């Protein structure tokens, strides 16, 4: 089941009702507007959905390939995008990049100034890392290091990004100019998420080997580290437990509270929003086990949040912005992923090339209590390794 958002049952119910209303409106719009999907496409999508439920990944790869062929034949960018997303989850990054780029070109056409990986000399390069929904930063953070790699191909490169990420990207890629999304900028060549993935993200092994961590403010990192270290000699572990999304399945509060109580670490909340009701349930009477630092608000100051994350020894989190940021900074992390086939996390293996220092633990039909037991064992191994080596990332 999904945790009550931040510990408030009322907010959880209201949010769920809102989701149902949005789904109803979307269904109604689908009935009365836009082209109808051919019966063959609907049957193919139903087949793919059944394979996902059975977790038949070999069968799904074949089904996804059928979906891609159908999408290409029908010139259907939405179906093509879905096939690309599925291939990434299945670990076929080359096919995923190809389909996503083709889907974008079908929707918007191929631009004459589209960058395809060539050296640009004196030509300027504009790299757009802007999502339609500024609250959704996972894809932006994932592709940020690819933007830095692309910037090296031009004497003058500009990266356009959501304002909260300007500082950390500018610090990480000082040779580029990083500007907020609202800035009107032009370039001789233009690159998007899809172009970056096509140029740099088709080989999973190379993607992992070429990892460049985002660089948090070193002075702020040290400030947070000293503050938290003054409270404990235990390892410092970031924790993010909940989501506003009703489509995500995450551990409930009693399961998280048991995990906290059983783990020899000092936890630091990385959860966004109004979390005080949740803190009471997670601490379970032991306030000292979980630090809540109200000087940090990731919705306002992502650079400060990045420094807080970088100050920690490890992170345990569900799939959210904290997961992507911890992975992109290079903090050893444990990512808890549900069985819903809707995010970029892999469905097989325990690693993702996007974040080489992260460990992916999928639910795989188990109770969350057992998943958290595994997370505890993997976290213990991470902390033991850190204690045996000089600190540094």
Question: Language-model features: where?
Answer:
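Catalytic machinery of carbohydrate-active enzymes
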Residues: 2-393
């Amino acid at each position: 089941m999904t945790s009550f958002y931040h510990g408030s049952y009322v907010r959880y119910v209201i949010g769920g009702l809102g989701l149902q209303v949005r789904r109803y409106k979307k269904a109604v719009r689908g009935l009365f507007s836009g082209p109808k999907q051919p019966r063959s496409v609907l049957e193919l999508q139903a087949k793919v959905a059944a394979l996902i439920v059975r977790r038949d990944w070999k069968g799904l790869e074949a089904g996804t390939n059928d979906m891609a062929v159908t999408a290409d034949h029908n010139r259907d960018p939405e179906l093509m995008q879905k096939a690309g997303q599925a291939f990434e989850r299945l670990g076929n990054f080359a096919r995923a990049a190809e389909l996503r780029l083709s889907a974008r070109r079908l929707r918007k056409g191929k631009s004459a100034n589209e960058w395809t990986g060539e050296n640009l000399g004196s030509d300027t390069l504009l790299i757009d890392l802007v999502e339609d929904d500024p609250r959704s930063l996972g894809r932006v953070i994932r592709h940020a290091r690819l933007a830095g790699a692309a910037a090296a191909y031009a004497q003058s490169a500009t990266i356009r990004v959501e304002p909260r990420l300007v500082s950390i990207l500018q610090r990480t890629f000082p040779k580029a100019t990083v500007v907020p999304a609202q800035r009107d900028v032009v370039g001789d060549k233009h690159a998007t998420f899809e172009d970056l993935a096509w140029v740099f993200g088709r080989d999973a092994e190379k993607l992992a080997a070429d990892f460049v961590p985002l660089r948090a403010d070193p002075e702020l990192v040290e400030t947070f580290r000293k503050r938290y270290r003054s409270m404990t000699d235990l390892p410092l572990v970031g924790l993010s437990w909940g989501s506003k999304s009703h489509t995500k399945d995450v551990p409930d509060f009693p399961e998280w509270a048991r995990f906290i109580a059983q783990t020899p670490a000092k936890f630091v909340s990385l959860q966004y929003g109004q979390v005080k009701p949740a803190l009471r349930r997670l601490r379970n009477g032991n306030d000292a086990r979980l630090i809540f630092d109200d000087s940090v608000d990731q919705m306002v100051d992502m650079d400060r949040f990045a420094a807080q994350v970088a100050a920690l020894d490890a992170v345990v989190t569900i799939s959210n912005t904290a997961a992507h940021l911890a992975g992109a900074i290079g903090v050893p992390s444990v990512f808890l992923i549900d069985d819903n086939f809707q995010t970029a996390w892999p469905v097989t293996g325990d690693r993702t090339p996007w974040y080489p220092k992260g460990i992916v633990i999928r639910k795989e039909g188990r109770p969350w209590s057992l998943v958290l037991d595994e997370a505890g064992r993997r976290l213990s191994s991470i902390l033991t390794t850190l204690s045996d080596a000089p600190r540094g990332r």
